[in-house]
Each structure stands twice: as structure tokens, then as C-alpha cells.
From Swiss-Prot:
<feature type="binding site">
    <location>
        <position position="269"/>
    </location>
    <ligand>
        <name>ATP</name>
    </ligand>
</feature>
<dbReference type="InterPro" id="IPR002133">
    <property type="entry name" value="S-AdoMet_synthetase"/>
</dbReference>
<feature type="binding site">
    <location>
        <position position="16"/>
    </location>
    <ligand>
        <name>Mg(2+)</name>
    </ligand>
</feature>
<feature type="region of interest" description="Flexible loop">
    <location>
        <begin position="101"/>
        <end position="111"/>
    </location>
</feature>
<dbReference type="InterPro" id="IPR022628">
    <property type="entry name" value="S-AdoMet_synt_N"/>
</dbReference>
<keyword id="KW-0963">Cytoplasm</keyword>
<dbReference type="Pfam" id="PF02773">
    <property type="entry name" value="S-AdoMet_synt_C"/>
</dbReference>
<dbReference type="GO" id="GO:0006730">
    <property type="term" value="P:one-carbon metabolic process"/>
</dbReference>
<feature type="binding site" description="in other chain">
    <location>
        <begin position="248"/>
        <end position="249"/>
    </location>
    <ligand>
        <name>ATP</name>
    </ligand>
</feature>
<comment type="similarity">
    <text>Belongs to the AdoMet synthase family.</text>
</comment>
<keyword id="KW-0630">Potassium</keyword>
<dbReference type="GO" id="GO:0006556">
    <property type="term" value="P:S-adenosylmethionine biosynthetic process"/>
</dbReference>
<feature type="binding site">
    <location>
        <position position="42"/>
    </location>
    <ligand>
        <name>K(+)</name>
    </ligand>
</feature>
<dbReference type="GO" id="GO:0000287">
    <property type="term" value="F:magnesium ion binding"/>
</dbReference>
<dbReference type="GO" id="GO:0005737">
    <property type="term" value="C:cytoplasm"/>
</dbReference>
<feature type="binding site" description="in other chain">
    <location>
        <position position="55"/>
    </location>
    <ligand>
        <name>L-methionine</name>
    </ligand>
</feature>
<dbReference type="InterPro" id="IPR022631">
    <property type="entry name" value="ADOMET_SYNTHASE_CS"/>
</dbReference>
């Protein structure tokens, strides 16, 4: 039975993503100066006000002034450097409330002479891979990200004038009964713009310089529908139009809804939080399975208890596409990979200040970024199972 599946992405100027980028920028700054730091940073944006709050335990002297300066650079990077869109890095108001991590949490997480490092919280995490693309991502989320990347590019490079930083995309893909993508059935693309720019010019520019530059021709048909700025006007955008908050784009950050999600956000969290580190590891493992050719798709779930090092469960599902059983794959993972938090952190190099590059256009599938969890360097372990 064929079906249509849709996924969305948002631009780097979307208020929720600006919040995420500020949080990850502060996290990277702290980790650069103290790789053992504990961070759980949240950011909220409302109109022209920026709130930065949460918990940080570090030997680095992190002042409010340093945090605000980091936030200003992050906001500028996201495109808010012009007062014509009301919200901008220089004129925004900043409020900071950062305090230390709870001693009760540290008691269960920190490594001591008598206890190994435990998980920073309980929770379930999913990783996923599918052979739709060379990035091993489902095609709808991959194309949605490509649209928002291109949208930012044409604005920043001046290819299209009169655009604002805020924007969103959505792509619908028709799949056949074997879960193979056939064609794109619908594209939604919304971009903030200056008041002087007409809807007709926005539509023409988006078709020519974004959509037709990104969507492969063989996926477009005469029946493909296009919805470009469908409300007719998108001048008020960013935090002025909608408040922004860290952790509100979980599905954009992962697999566009094609796989399940455990509910934990990524941005602002150091790797002792398994919401982030275990999700990255689960993605890495799913990629090895699919990249080895023993399955066309793979979903992996990990679950942890706070303060406990070993995962309480490991679940593998290849949805009937694998050449060996799910149980054999799970046993192979348990045999060859250490899934304790400290081991994951060391294996993936997650004490390094690498996180702000993950914030925009998804945390997965960025082959050009050389992120450790995107490498296909252990596929031989699974190739040997066949």
C-alpha cells in the first residue's frame, strides 16, 4: 500500500532555533574552557527580550556579561542584525539566571573512586537510519532541511533581496508499498520578507532560487503542489511574531517524525545528559546497521535510569528489512559497543565544543561536518553477520 509522508524544517532565524543556537553557543564556550563542565541551559525569546537560564557547574568563570556577549553573537549569526525586523542582537534586552547543578543530581552522575559515571537522568532515546539518501535519512526531512539551508544561503549571499531570517519548509513524499520514495507531492515554503516585497516576487524567487535548486527533477511531477507563503504576507517574524524556546523543535532536530522520539531535547545540554549523548549513539549504531547493507531501515531504542551506568534496555527494529534477526543485531551491539554514558562520551568525543554546528537543519545527516555519530566506521562488524 502506497502512502504520503510529510516532514518539516525551520530556518536558522526561526525563534525556537535562535533559542537553541544561543544555548548551544554558551555550551560550546563552557566546554572549550572546561571539558568536564555540566550544563543544562534554557533560552526563551519574547518580542525583543532574551531570557537565558538554567544550571551550569564548571571551573570556568562564566559571568553574565560573557553569556550576554555570546548570545549577541549567536543572534547576529542567525540573521538578526538589522533593526528593520525589530528584534536584533544589539538592541535586545537580556536577562540571565544561571546557577549550579543540583548536588543531588551530581551525587548520582559524577564518577568517584567507588562509582562509575551514571546517566544524567532517566529516559528513552531513539536512533534511526533509512536508505532513502546517502545520508541515511528519510527523504522528507532531508529535503525539508535542504530547503531551509538554501533559503538561508540565498538571503545571506544576496541572491534574493528583501528576505528576513525567519522561515519554514515542509515536504510531502509519496512512498510505495516497499517504503521506497517515488515522488514529491507537495512543498510548503514560507519566508519572512520586507514589507515592500510583493507576494508574486516572493513566489517567483522561491521557485527559481530555492525549490528548483534543491528538489531533484526526477521527484517533481506535473501534480506536485507548491504552497509559497500561503498566508500571503510574512513581514512580522522571529521572536516578534512568535516567542522562541529551547527544545521545541525535537522532530525537526531528528527524523521528521519518521521514527519515534523519546521526548528529550538536545540543545544546551552537555553529554552527561543521555537525552543528547545516547540519542547520538543510537543514531550512530542505526547507521552502521543500514550502512552495512544488512537492513534497509533500522530504529534503535536505549533506556537509562538516573545515576546508573548500564542501559536498562536495548531495542532494535528493522521493520522486516534485515537479512538477520533483530535479536542478532541487538546481541552484536551489546557485544561490540559500550553503551555506558562515559564510554559513549569518550567514543564520540562529546566533551569537545562541537554542538552549535548541530543546531540548525537537524542533528543528523551532516556528512560535511565530520560529526562522530555520522561516521560509517564499524560497518564490518555487521557485514560479518550475513
Amino acid at each position: 500500500m502506497s502512502y504520503i509522508f510529510s516532514s518539516e524544517s525551520v530556518s536558522k532565524g526561526h525563534p525556537d532555533k535562535v533559542a537553541d543556537f544561543i544555548a548551544d553557543s554558551v555550551l560550546d564556550l563552557v566546554l572549550k574552557n572546561d571539558p568536564k563542565a555540566r550544563c543544562a541551559i534554557e533560552v526563551a525569546l519574547a518580542h525583543t527580550t532574551v531570557y537565558i537560564f538554567g544550571e551550569v557547574s564548571t571551573s570556568y568563570i562564566l559571568t553574565d556579561e560573557i553569556i550576554i556577549e555570546t548570545a549577541k553573537k549567536a543572534i547576529d549569526f542567525c540573521g538578526y542584525n538589522d533593526e528593520k525586523f525589530i528584534f536584533d542582537a544589539k538592541s535586545a534586552t537580556y536577562h540571565v539566571n544561571i546557577h549550579k547543578q543540583s548536588a543531588d543530581i551530581a551525587l548520582g552522575v559524577d564518577e568517584t573512586d567507588n562509582k562509575e559515571q551514571g546517566a544524567g537522568d532517566q529516559g528513552i532515546m531513539f536512533g534511526y537510519a533509512k536508505d532513502d539518501t546517502k545520508e541515511l535519512l528519510p527523504l522528507p526531512i532531508f529535503l525539508a532541511h535542504e530547503l531551509t539551508k538554501r533559503l538561508a544561503f540565498v538571503r545571506e549571499e544576496g541572491i534574493v533581496s528583501g528576505l528576513g531570517p525567519d522561515g519554514k519548509s515542509q515536504v510531502s513524499v509519496l512512498y510505495n508499498e516497499n517504503h521506497e520514495p517515488l515522488e514529491v507531492t507537495a512543498i510548503v515554503l514560507s519566508t519572512q520578507h520586507e514589507a515592500s516585497k510583493t507576494l508574486e516576487s516572493v513566489k517567483a524567487d522561491m521557485m527559481k532560487h530555492v525549490i528548483l535548486e534543491v528538489i531533484p527533477k526526477h521527484l517533481i511531477t506535473d501534480n506536485t503542489k507548491y504552497y509559497i507563503n500561503p498566508t500571503g504576507r510574512f513581514v512580522i517574524g522571529g521572536p516578534v511574531g512568535d516567542s522562541g524556546l529551547t527544545g521545541r523543535k525535537l522532530i525537526v532536530d531528528t527524523y521528521g517524525g519518521y521514527s519515534r522520539h523519546g521526548g528529550g531535547a538536545f540543545s544546551g545540554k552537555d553529554a552527561s545528559k543521555v537525552d543528547r549523548s545516547a540519542s547520538y549513539m543510537a543514531r550512530y549504531l542505526a547507521k552502521q546497521v543500514v550502512g552495512s547493507g544488512i537492513a534497509k531501515t533500522c530504529e534503535i531504542q536505549l533506556a537509562y535510569a538516573i545515576g546508573v551506568a548500564e542501559p536498562v534496555s536495548l531495542y532494535v527494529n528493522t521493520f522486516g528489512t534485515s537479512k538477520v534477526s533483530n535479536e542478532v543485531i541487538a546481541e552484536t551491539i551489546s557485544k561490540h559497543f559500550d553503551l555506558r554514558p562515559k564510554a559513549i562520551i569518550n567514543y564520540l568525543g562529546l566533551t569537545n565544543p562541537i554542538f552549535k554546528q548541530t543546531t540548525h537543519n537537524g542533528h543528523f545527516g551532516k556528512l560535511e561536518s565530520n560529526l562522530s555519530w555520522e561516521k560509517l566506521d564499524k560497518i564490518e562488524i555487521f557485514e560479518q553477520l550475513v
